Amino acid sequence: MVGVPHAQADSNRDPKVRAQNVSDAFSVPDVADAEHPVAHTDSEELIATGADSALVDAAQARDEAARLAPLRLMAVHAHPDDESSKGAATLAKYSADGVGVVVVSCTGGERGDVLNKKLTIDSAEIPALRIREMARAAEILGVAHVWLGFHDTGYHEGPPESWDLPAGSFGVLDPEVEIEALVRVVRQYRPHVMTTYDESGGYPHPDHIRCHVVSVGAFEAAGDPDAYPDAGPPWQPLKLYYNVGFSRSRITAINEAVREQTGEGPYDEWIKRFSDQARPDPGTRITSQVAVADYFHVRDAALRAHETQIDPDSTWFAVPRDLEAQVWGTEDYELARSLVDTTLPEDDLFAGVREKVSS
């Protein structure tokens, strides 16, 4: 296993040397372009944007720790900020427990709007800002982070058949190219457990739907020596989970608990949208619930780090966390694939994995 060298020698204070150290950690194709990007770590992006050396060192240290830990978890998301709104407390908990955690962002979120009304930002600034925001969120969660390198497709209204997706974006490229890119990262970090979205993407965003396709494809191909032989030595993850963050049962339970205290339900409009949707409630598919109430404050801090993407006065933060902990103190998942024996329901994503790894 090749780790990212942590900057210790004097020569590593040179940004060019440190950037080469990061690049050397990946087995990458000889040619990179918009349709065949090279995955890169937070530290490489921070160097490119002129970030303080302490931030770079911290990112490299988290990356090395994620590779060397005896148990390893990879969370695959569509955009920066998704990791902080979907399963963030789980990532923080496992990181605090000594699990090596790496987040993979399939795109850079370049087409995201500025959702914080307090900010006035030119659209040209968004890509660099989102790099910094993601680095801060990763530091708060205690996780490593990898950019898969594809371009954001942007959100599109209406049914999928009406979408006019931009050329060269994540949602329209050949999925095989994207799967190979993620297989390369899986084989580098060797996770025992992976998390991503279900086939609906969690909500109808083309990048979220494609993230599901790519994540499942990589889980199934990474351990096959005949699949993508140039993407590094094979490694087979043992379990794949889908995030179930916004089940109707969870949102309704929290909403009614707040209403009992205040007379108002912060999620009333959200619940109405649920009733208008044709797709089934993902909550009916929950198999695994991880107790993470002690890390809700970490989750919130990580989400606030994405300041262009979240209004600090939004309903995301309208629920008292002690009340949320009492009503629904877990983050929820659907076990989609398992190559180890386990008993459902679970309270640990590593159920069955710990025994296999230690044997």
Please provide the spans of the model-predicted regions:
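Active-site rim/loop-helix segments in enzyme catalytic domains that contact anionic ligands
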Residues: V2-A9, D14, R18-D30, V38-Y189, ...
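C-terminal accessory domains and tails appended to enzymatic cores
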Residues: V2-A9, R13-P29, S43-A51, L55-Q60, ...
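Divalent metal-coordination and catalytic microenvironments
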Residues: D81, T107, M134, H145, ...
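Active-site environment of divalent metal-dependent phosphoester hydrolases
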Residues: E83, E110-D113, E199-P206, R248-R250
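Residue-level recognition of the N-termini of beta-strands and the immediately preceding loop/turn
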Residues: V101, H192, W235-K239
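Short, well-ordered beta-to-alpha junction loops that form the rim of enzyme active sites
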Residues: G149-H151, T196-S200, P206, Y242-G245
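A mobile, often basic/glycine-rich helix-loop segment
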Residues: L173, Y203-D224
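Proline-aspartate-enriched helix->loop->beta-strand connector
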Residues: E178, L182-S200, H208-C211
